[in-house]
């Protein structure tokens, strides 16, 4: 039997409406689409996933007390450079970053993961500039 060598496949564009969807459950579906694990010919070392456009990221839902208790931290490397931002404030100022952060943690770390992450397009409102690619609406 010959060794299977995967070919580069033409990615499709998918549109997902995040309104009323739970953050983590939606992020896992998006990560699966980005990696291409929904395809029967999936190969771990090839970027064969789809481009994913997410709209209405500002209307995403979280369960429990996460709005007040979940805190995003980042460190600049300097003394006193630790920034802490609660989820509630992050949703108010940059709602697309919340979903991007959740999906990025579910992708592989390394060059392939960075390449896959570039295929994710998240927008706070209902409009997006990817009409020319004719993304197909996917119900999650």
UniProtKB/Swiss-Prot annotation:
It comes from the Bacteria. NCBIfam families: rplM_bact. Gene3D superfamilies: Ribosomal protein L13 (3.90.1180.10). One of its GO terms (cellular component) is cytosolic large ribosomal subunit. It holds the Pfam family Ribosomal_L13. Part of the 50S ribosomal subunit. InterPro entries: Ribosomal_uL13 (IPR005822), Ribosomal_uL13_bac-type (IPR005823), Ribosomal_uL13_CS (IPR023563), Ribosomal_uL13_sf (IPR036899). Keywords: Ribonucleoprotein, Ribosomal protein. The gene is rplM. GO terms for molecular function: mRNA binding; structural constituent of ribosome. This is Large ribosomal subunit protein uL13. GO terms for biological process: negative regulation of translation; translation.
